[in-house]
Amino acid sequence: MKTFLILVLLAIVATTATTAVRFPVPQLQPQNPSQQQPQEQVPLVQQQQFLGQQQPFPPQQPYPQPQPFPSQLPYLQLQPFPQPQLPYSQPQPFRPQQPYPQPQPQYSQPQQPISQQQQQQQQQQQQQQQQQQILQQILQQQLIPCMDVVLQQHNIAHGRSQVLQQSTYQLLQELCCQHLWQIPEQSQCQAIHNVVHAIILHQQQKQQQQPSSQVSFQQPLQQYPLGQGSFRPSQQNPQAQGSVQPQQLPQFEEIRNLALQTLPAMCNVYIPPYCTIAPFGIFGTN
């Protein structure tokens, strides 16, 4: 290749030399012909020198280095493009239609709170029953002073002599108010009804023991020592003795009105209006 390039360059220089010799000839025609010949030979020698100097052009050999253009082969590495086609087949798991039956148990889940509500209602009912039982126990033991206070007022209203001394009566008032304050407000009306109910049943028991005698409210439910404030709660449950008979309803209304006038004012307790008109037995006293 080098020799071929050298030969080509020599041929090119030869042709250029001949052409260079030809062109200056017509320019030198007006001059003497003897002077033209040496001028023609001088450039030939110089041109040969130029040829020797121009021979270094072969350093153009590094140009074949661009042959690495076959580096286009890496483009063949782009063949992985068909690989992404595989994920397109993967979306076939769109069968998640199966989870749609799963939400069905969710519809059954809201039904569970319904059972919880029922349990809460049952618990509330049990709590209410327990409160009623506790209230009844309190009434049996703690509200006896209130019963005696109402009986004392009943005797005074009917012009009977006071059975209890003033000091004992004042102590009963204090005890009655203390126990009445411990009862929740929503149960105070029931407490007063139970007080009246206990008085009626107590008198009914006395009437059964003395059928020939009329019902009398002169004696208190408990006998208190004169001048002393100690008392013993009744061991018997007055509510278990029976229920108020229809003929005793007027007596119940009379005592209830008296109790509603005496106890709230004495203890500064608020009693709702419906307590004065509520029919007997609505609070489960019978």
UniProtKB/Swiss-Prot annotation:
Q: Which family does it belong to?
A: Belongs to the gliadin/glutenin family.
What is the designated name of this protein?
Alpha/beta-gliadin
Q: Where is this region: Disordered?
A: 51-120
Q: Which residue windows does the record flag with biased composition (Pro residues)?
A: 56-71, 93-104
Give additional notes from the record: The alpha/beta-gliadins can be divided into 5 homology classes. Sequence divergence between the classes is due to single base substitutions and to duplications or deletions within or near direct repeats. There are more than a 100 copies of the gene for alpha/beta-gliadin per haploid genome.
Establish whether keyword Signal is in the entry: yes
Query: Which residues constitute the signal peptide according to the record?
Result: 1-20
Task: Report keywords, A-Z.
Answer: Allergen, Repeat, Seed storage protein, Signal, Storage protein
Q: Where is the composition biased (Low complexity)?
A: 72-92, 105-120
PANTHER family in the record:
ALPHA_BETA-GLIADIN MM1, PROLAMIN PPROL 14P
Q: Which Gene3D superfamilies match?
A: Plant lipid-transfer and hydrophobic proteins (1.10.110.10)
